[in-house]
Design a protein with these regions (language model features):
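Outer membrane beta-barrel
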Residues: 104, 108-258, 278-295, 302-313, ...
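Active-site-proximal beta-alpha loop/turn segments in soluble metabolic enzymes
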Residues: 256-275
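Outer-membrane beta-barrel pore domains
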Residues: 140, 186-188, 210, 307-470
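Bacterial N-terminal signal peptides
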Residues: 8-18
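N-terminal periplasmic/intermembrane-space "pro-region" immediately following the signal or transit peptide
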Residues: 22-127, 263, 287-290, 296-299, ...
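Bacterial N-terminal signal peptides that target proteins for export
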Residues: 1-9
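Interfacial loop-to-helix transition and helix-capping segments at the boundaries
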Residues: 274-279, 334-338
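Intrinsically disordered, low-complexity Ser/Thr- and acidic-rich flexible linkers and loops
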Residues: 91, 266-267, 299, 445-451
Length: 470
């Protein structure tokens, strides 16, 4: 330590000796020092200015923070927060309850609510069809057109106690008046994988065109032949068998809905009727289908998307009923007998489809004698893009009754469908032309066709429809 001190003193003395003469020659500081001091003062002033700016900005930030802290919780924001908290708590409580009960809910093609053990399930679905129809025929009121909610349906379905016991309840708001009416209400029990029994109110297993949902038709509406010759809904019991290639249904019911020609020849309508109503002694309906190629699921509609496999389906149906014996005095038989049969074939190629059917109804009426009605429907469609499809349909029908002579039905329809999301969201349009007069046995207000007079001009119907199925 002593050596270092001595060394420092020697270095200091040497420096004094070196600079001493210069200080003696000029007592004023050198210009380089003045410049250095000036720059130091400028830097101090700049630093002070920047410090003042920082202090001003900090003051503004503090004022803004104070304003935000005082004003952010306004009445509106407080209400929004309370609602949000309430919704979150309610949702959490619901989820907690469902979890405690083992229940599940959500969306899988349809809205559903189910028990955790799988014993109970409820599905909710709906259909809305909004339509515009324009009609021309050669009568004093030549042109008619307008909008309507053609179908507004709500369906509840699922199973109870076991997946083997299924149910369906469906209602529709009428397009005229808007009243709500029951359409289907049935229970089905699966005895085995192949056999099941159904009882309640349902469509009779007769012709394929009527059995296909209105949401999954090819044209805007079913054919006029179908509107006159289908059996509609009834109340009864049905046994059914289904395997990989065969389906068979046999129904014993109150009666078929008499829509043949619109003349009410048989006069039965068993939809939503009491048990002791005078209708028929008995009514039996049966349908058999053979799946030659493809899968059953692809024949739930008439179309065939471009990625679908080839399918071929053959079908035949029959119906027989005899009216109620009234016991009233008569010189002859007073019960009508009604026999009907139909055959059909459906083919799908993945981007193209075709369907054809032939139907015959025979009514033995005590007043009018034998009545024979025949109908043919042929239709086909092809996809131009994965979502756009064009189609055409031809209809022929003849109504033979001894007391009157009617023109045969000849009808051609062409149109297209655009599938935004399959059948769930679909836009359809078509135009139909009556090649001959459309007379009473075949007119249909639902389909947009009126009764023609004695006219050489064809009746024309233009229809557009937007559909939502969920």
């Amino acid at each position: 330590m002593l050596g270092i001190a001595r060394l420092s003193l020697l270095v200091g003395a040497g420096l004094l000796l070196a600079v001493g003469p210069s200080l003696a020659d000029d007592a004023s500081p050198p210009s380089s020092i003045d410049e250095l001091l000036r720059r130091i003062r400028e830097l101090e002033e700049t630093g002070a200015s920047r410090q003042r700016e920082l202090e001003r900005q900090q003051q503004e930030i503090d004022e803004l923070r104070q304003q935000v802290g005082d004003n952010w919780l306004t009445q509106r924001r407080a209400e929004e927060i309370r609602n949000l908290v309430s919704d979150v708590l309610a949702d959490a409580d619901t989820r907690s309850t469902l979890m405690q009960d083992g229940m599940t809910a959500g969306w899988s093609e349809q809205f559903f609510l189910a028990s955790g053990d799988g014993r109970f399930k409820l599905q909710v679905s709906g259909l809305q069809q909004f339509r515009y129809i324009w009609n021309f025929h050669d009568q004093p009121d030549r042109y008619r057109g307008g909008f309507e909610n053609t179908r507004t349906k709500i369906t509840l379905r699922g199973h109870v106690i076991s997946p083997d016991l299924t149910y369906l309840i469906r209602g529709n708001f009428a397009r005229a008046g808007g009243s709500f009416g029951l359409e289907d209400a049935w229970l089905r029990y699966h005895l085995t994988n192949e056999w099941n029994v159904r009882f309640g109110q349902f469509k009779l297993p007769f012709n394929r065109e009527e059995l296909i949902s209105p949401a999954k038709q090819l044209a805007v509406e079913r054919s006029l032949v179908n509107e006159s010759l289908n059996l509609g809904r009834s109340q009864g019991i049905e046994m059914a068998y289904a395997d990989e290639a065969n389906r068979l249904s046999l129904a014993f019911s109150d009666a078929g809905q008499d829509q043949v020609g619109g003349f009410n020849l048989v006069g039965t309508n068993a939809q939503n009727t009491p048990a002791l109503r005078e209708d028929t002694e008995y009514a039996i309906t049966s349908r058999y289908e053979y799946l030659a190629a493809g899968s059953w699921g692809q024949f739930n509609d008439f179309t065939s998307p471009v990625d679908e496999e080839f399918g071929l389906l053959l079908g035949v149906g029959a119906h027989y009923q005899q009216d109620e014996f009234t016991g009233r005095f008569s010189f002859g038989r007073n019960e009508e007998r009604w026999f009907a049969w139909t055959v059909d074939v459906s083919a799908e190629w993945g981007g193209a489809n075709a369907f054809a059917s032939f139907s015959h109804h025979y009514i033995d009426d005590p007043s009018f004698g034998a009545v024979n009605v025949y109908g043919v429907v042929g239709q086909a469609g092809v996809y131009f893009t994965p979502k756009f499809e064009v189609f055409t349909r031809f209809e022929w029908g003849t109504f033979n009754i001894g007391i009157a002579d009617f023109h045969d039905l000849y009808l051609v329809t062409i149109g297209g469908n655009y599938y935004f999301d399959g059948h769930d969201i679909k836009l359809s349009a078509d135009i139909g032309v009556g090649l001959y007069a459309v007379e009473q046995p075949w007119d249909s207000d639902l389909a947009g066709w009126r009764i023609d007079g004695n006219s050489a001009e064809p009746q024309v119907v233009i229809r557009t429809q937007f559909q939502l199925l969920f």
